[in-house]
Regions:
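Bacterial N-terminal signal peptides that target proteins for export
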Residues: 1-13
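A generic structural signal for short, non-catalytic loop/turn and secondary-structure boundary residues
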Residues: 10-14, 99, 197-199
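Histidine/acidic-residue-rich, glycine-tolerant segments that coordinate divalent metal ions
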Residues: 128-139, 145-146, 163-209
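Hydrophobic alpha-helical segments, especially transmembrane helices
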Residues: 8-10, 53, 145-148, 206
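Acidic/His- and Gly-rich active-site-bordering loop/insert found
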Residues: 28-140, 146-167
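Bacterial N-terminal signal peptides
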Residues: 10-24
């Protein structure tokens, strides 16, 4: 199985490279950009790893992601993004503008699953929440904890490289992906009317291996 560190790094690199294809820039120095991305990842890796472990240890079910959303909102505000919380109940939207150009949406999912964790990890979840009327163990069994950590890392990388692109970045945290409903709730709450309508949208999903 691929290590968490490898998944964080490789997913972050892949997403930033994909974003680079969508935003206008001057002459493209691919090798130079990859080196800059790697430097940014290396500089923030210990912080992102700690964020991942914190999120993993404190999972929350769909539309109950209050701690998770607040944690990510604080991270994005600290980076300088303009953040709106409570979009679609527990969703968040974080925006930064960097001159003229397309609006790029980057999405992560926020919720966990109603399952007991049996990994034995030192940061394993001991959380429980109400699911279908019963107190139930909860864990991040589908990689959303990694998705969120990568999402924050990419937000920082794009700021570090802002002299190499132009446009608007719109980072969204979607609640209730498991079982559905979260995306519709955000759209119904004005995701594409209260905020810039994206020209492109990106997301990722890690694999088990």
């Amino acid at each position: 199985m691929a290590s968490i560190g490898f998944q964080l790094r490789s997913s972050g690199l892949a997403l930033v490279v994909a974003l680079g294809l969508a935003v206008p820039a001057g002459a493209v120095d691919t090798a130079g950009q990859r080196a800059a991305i790697t430097r940014s990842l290396d500089a923030q890796y210990s912080r992102i790893d700690a964020l991942y472990k914190d999120i993993h240890a404190h999972p929350e079910l769909g539309f109950q992601e209050t701690r998770t959303a607040a944690k990510l909102a604080a991270e994005m505000r600290a980076l300088g993004y303009e953040v709106t919380e409570g979009v679609g109940r527990t969703g968040i939207v974080a925006i930064t503008k960097n001159g003229p150009g397309p609006t790029i949406m980057v999405r992560t999912d926020l919720d966990a699953l109603p399952l007991p964790e049996k990994t034995g990890l030192p940061y394993a979840s001991k959380a429980t929440q109400i699911w279908r009327g019963k107190e139930t163990p909860v864990m991040h069994a589908c990689g959303h904890d990694i998705h969120m950590a990568v999402w924050v890392a990419v937000a920082k990388i794009m700021l570090d490289l802002k002299d190499q692109w132009s446009g608007t970045l719109m980072f969204i945290g979607q609640p209730a992906e498991e079982g559905g409903g979260g995306a519709k709730a955000m759209v119904a709450d004005g995701l594409f009317t209260r905020f810039p309508k994206p020209d492109y949208g990106f997301a990722l999903h890690v694999g088990p291996g």
